[in-house]
Amino acid sequence: MPNPKRRHSKKRTSTRRAHDALKQPGLSECPNCHEPKVPHRVCPHCGQYKGREVVEVVAE
């Protein structure tokens, strides 16, 4: 197995890790219940997508 010949510097390590940060999901507003939801997905609060009820939500 190959091993590193030299130690990587802190700058080189942090430069490589600069793109590893998690991005916040872009949320949109549900037109039916006005709760935040992920675009192009069923609303977890009311169960609607594109004006149709796709998932039946159980009331607690």
Swiss-Prot record:
Start-end of Basic residues biased regions: 1-16
Alphabetized Pfam families for the sequence: Ribosomal_L32p
UniProt keyword Ribosomal protein, yes or no: yes
Top-level taxonomic group: Bacteria
Region called Disordered, residue ranges: 1-28
Stretches assigned to coiled coil: none
GO MF entry, a single one: structural constituent of ribosome
Keywords, ordered alphabetically: Ribonucleoprotein, Ribosomal protein
The protein's name in its UniProt record: Large ribosomal subunit protein bL32
